[in-house]
Amino acid sequence: MKGRGIVWASWVGTAVFAATALAARADSPDRFVDRGPLYPAMVVALALFAASLPLAIYALAKGALRTARNEEKVTVGGLFFLSRSAPPPVRLALLGSLAACLVVTAVTAAAEPFGILVPVWPLALCGVWAARHGSFPPIPQPSR
């Protein structure tokens, strides 16, 4: 599978986020006493979000360059949601990581609000995979 490291990074980030956010949620019934598990969850969420921003910008820039240089029709859906740009196993793995991240975010958002930033991580990695390895259709040439 092409881009195995990208898929691996997506799942590792999602797993670390899930572990820390679920620990923060388990600790949340008494919100005004010791909030120890909240701090690692907050650090992980902010670190994943901060790391995802340059990745998303890279994916967008690389996709724009592919459009400009190769005359490929790189779309936002194809770039970030792998619509018709990735083989099914890759799409399943990367979008599965995004779905898992969204579920954890929904379950833990009340206890760990910084977690709502984390789904940008697997989404940015979808973009990086598509920008590097995705296949896009050619831009149709106008008839003369």
List each language-model region with its residue ranges.
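Short membrane-interface loop/juxtamembrane segments of multi-pass integral membrane proteins
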Residues: 73-100
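Hydrophobic, membrane-inserted alpha-helices
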Residues: 96-108, 121-124
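Juxtamembrane loop-transmembrane helix junctions in multi-pass integral membrane proteins
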Residues: 1, 5, 32-43, 85-93, ...
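Membrane interfacial helix motifs at helix-loop boundaries and amphipathic/re-entrant anchors
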Residues: 19-47, 74, 105-120
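Alpha-helical transmembrane segments and their immediate juxtamembrane interface regions
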Residues: 116-144
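Membrane-water interface of transmembrane alpha-helices
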Residues: 54-76
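Cytosolic-side membrane-entry/anchor segment at the start of a transmembrane helix
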Residues: 1-19, 133-144
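Canonical alpha-helical transmembrane segments of integral membrane proteins
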Residues: 11-25, 97-103
